[in-house]
């Protein structure tokens, strides 16, 4: 049991930007295409965070050309370059699945957190 925790702790990322559900983020993710490697940004609203430790994931949703696109990222993945928080959102739910039913601009409307 301690061996698993030791291996897990050395693979955990230390420099993760703190963010919450409802925040609008831009995720920079390394994509490997053949022999090339490039960084692909994905911007949207965080609708879910789940898991803990090395298995923690988060899901980002955006509307692209009228179609909702969701992408789930492992938080401690070596391919995750950085996470940039664009706007802080104020929500009262841990999972924002209700955004899936919304159409148009309502799908991206979340109250902004005043700091």
Swiss-Prot record:
NCBIfam families, per the entry: rplS_bact
InterPro entries, alphabetized: Ribosomal_bL19, Ribosomal_bL19_CS, Ribosomal_bL19_sf, Translation_prot_SH3-like_sf
Protein family: Belongs to the bacterial ribosomal protein bL19 family.
One Pfam family matching this protein: Ribosomal_L19
Gene label: rplS
Name listed for the protein in its UniProt record: Large ribosomal subunit protein bL19
Keyword Oxidoreductase: no
PROSITE patterns from the UniProt entry: RIBOSOMAL_L19
Function: This protein is located at the 30S-50S ribosomal subunit interface and may play a role in the structure and function of the aminoacyl-tRNA binding site.
């Amino acid at each position: 049991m301690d061996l698993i925790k030791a291996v897990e702790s050395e693979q955990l990322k230390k420099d993760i930007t703190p963010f919450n559900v409802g925040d609008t983020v831009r995720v920079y993710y390394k994509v490997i295409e053949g022999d090339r490697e490039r960084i692909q940004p994905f911007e949207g609203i965080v609708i879910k965070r789940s898991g803990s430790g090395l298995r923690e994931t988060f899901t980002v949703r955006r509307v692209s050309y009228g179609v909702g696109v969701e992408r789930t990222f492992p938080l401690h993945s070596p391919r995750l370059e950085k996470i940039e928080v664009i706007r802080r959102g104020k929500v009262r739910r841990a999972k924002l699945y209700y955004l899936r039913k919304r159409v148009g601009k309502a799908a991206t409307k979340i109250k902004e957190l005043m700091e």
